[in-house]
Amino acid sequence: MFYAGTPTVFKMPGGAQPAVNKDWLELASAKEGSQYVVSTTYAGERNYTVFYDTQMTTPLWTAYPLDSSHMGSLDRPSGWSYNPNIDEKYQVRVTDGSYSNSTYSRGHMCPNGSRNGNSTMQAQTFYVTNQVPQIQNSFNNGIWSNLENAVQGIAKSHNEEIYVVTGVAFEKEGESRTINYTSPSKSSSQRVPIPNYFYKLVLRVKYSGRTVSDASCIAFWFDQKAYSDSYQNHTVSVDQVEAWTGFDFFVNLPDDLESAAESKPTTWSSFTSF
């Protein structure tokens, strides 16, 4: 089944609309174009939403809620499968051995560790549309993994639902960068573009009754390279990520809260104590 969705026209500033559901706080705006697909996976409840570029065979952003019920101790499954909501011709044929002949691994957008409390949700994180080539040593298995664990720790320790966006970019708005390619295997004729940048945004909110009364965001931005320091050294404002990517994030927050939360970089310590 091919689900093209109805991506909304991106307008900046103001006028941005959620890609799927106005009640889902994790969502970003979508860009206009026939090459873009919005796909949400479900397992009795929403799992994650991916904004997918069929021309680049790349998830540009993946957004998901996260709370302690999503996390557990299920073993990591083997194998990868196509996303049934997107035409297979636009997907990379990834296996457990893909990129093993290079410096890259299959970097999850919505992590396995954020969905290993539910076998169906976990299996959906192994859709090929939920991964990109990511440098393994000292990035995927280092600073990036540490950041994923820290984000999961907030949801566990504070016993709340938080909202996460993981994204990639090939170049910043107004920038011209070389895009390099790899292949999923030595025998594959597919050329897979390698993102030059990775980012992760996290939102926490407070409620007055059922109304969002306060919000705090934190954003991280990384070049695709090896790191030896802490993710805490790589915070930027959400507004800065929006300027670099052309997306508007957390569009379902009330405008005043969104503006205040996104305008300045947040330190990890202040975010965790929110």
What are these regions (language model features)?
Residues 1-274:
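Domain-level detector for secreted/extracellular nuclease and nuclease-toxin modules, and
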